[in-house]
Amino acid sequence: MAVNGTALLLANVTYITVEILIGLCAIVGNVLVIWVVKLNPSLQTTTFYFIVSLALADIAVGVLVMPLAIVISLGITIQFYNCLFMTCLLLIFTHASIMSLLAIAVDRYLRVKLTVRYRRVTTQRRIWLALGLCWLVSFLVGLTPMFGWNMKLTSEHQRNVTFLSCQFSSVMRMDYMVYFSFFTWILIPLVVMCAIYLDIFYVIRNKLNQNFSSSKETGAFYGREFKTAKSLFLVLFLFAFSWLPLSIINCITYFHGEVPQIILYLGILLSHANSMMNPIVYAYKIKKFKETYLLIFKTYMICQSSDSLDSSTE
């Protein structure tokens, strides 16, 4: 019994320590992403506005979600609806990420399908509407349990409880997590995005193979689009790789019962680690990001003067 207690304590301490480290990396990395887009005029395009939206969601994970996840892991005694609201916040920014990724995929699709009309279709007003819709959907999906789909209104045991030890499973219904949050608002968008990127790659490949024009500009355009699409598909792949294990754990919990705490912790940490991955991907895969990262490092970290950025489009 004492050995189990010691192992659980060690697991809790390790989990909290890793959460803090991931949170700090996520905040610093994604603040850099926003800084890069602000500094580099060539990155101030529709796609990168959605990337900024994704970065804001990842910053929120570092600032809000991880501290709240730590509080929930400690099982602090608080009011039921306070605990429920904290768990809902954990979900809002997950869905903000998936909605931002969906917006990015749709934008790249329009870019290659409507080459000539793209700028007329993606007006500033429509971009802001799309961003607002992404966040509105995220808040509505994440806050749904506050309107009744929770353990208090559906469980006899919790109905008369005012204060409780705040645990995710104490307030959040697993049928909501599995059928609504995962199947409807994570899995279906992921499948749609994979289909979009497959079509993007198919269109670009056809355009490059057709060689219908002798213009080097056309070939260069689709070459850049192919590289950008590959980079953004990698971001999508990492999101799926990071979040699907935790969603599968939730499915196992709902259909077959509890999983070991250490497995749950690993799933949570992997999902949260996704928030610090994207800045690394951008640095390695998108040339303009790498150049601006280096500019920031030279100018602000080692106080070395650097040439200003050009405004050419990547």
Curated annotation (Swiss-Prot):
PROSITE patterns per the UniProt record, alphabetical: G_PROTEIN_RECEP_F1_1, G_PROTEIN_RECEP_F1_2
UniProt keywords, alphabetically: Cell membrane, Disulfide bond, G-protein coupled receptor, Glycoprotein, Lipoprotein, Membrane, Palmitate, Receptor, Transducer, Transmembrane, Transmembrane helix
Entry-listed glycosylation sites: 4, 12, 160
One GO cellular component term: plasma membrane
Principal location listed in the UniProt entry: membrane
Cytoplasmic compartment segments: 38-48, 107-126, 199-231, 285-314
Ranges annotated as spanning the membrane: 15-37, 49-72, 85-106, 127-148, 178-198, 232-255, 262-284
Family annotation (CDD domains): 7tmA_Adenosine_R_A3
Membrane topology: Multi-pass membrane protein
Gene Ontology terms describing biological process: G protein-coupled adenosine receptor signaling pathway; negative regulation of cell migration; negative regulation of cell population proliferation
Lipidation (S-palmitoyl cysteine): 303
Lineage: superkingdom: Eukaryota
Stored InterPro entries: Adeno_A3_rcpt, Adenosn_rcpt, GPCR_Rhodpsn, GPCR_Rhodpsn_7TM
Extracellular-side segments: 1-14, 73-84, 149-177, 256-261
Residues making up the signal peptide according to the UniProt record: none
Cystines in this chain: 83-166
Xref: SMART domains: 7TM_GPCR_Srsx
Single GO molecular function: G protein-coupled adenosine receptor activity
A Pfam family this chain is assigned to: 7tm_1
Compartment(s): Cell membrane
Role: Receptor for adenosine. The activity of this receptor is mediated by G proteins which inhibits adenylyl cyclase.
Family: Belongs to the G-protein coupled receptor 1 family.
Name of the protein described by the UniProt record: Adenosine receptor A3
Organism, scientific name: Canis lupus familiaris
Higher taxonomy: Eukaryota, Metazoa, Chordata, Craniata, Vertebrata
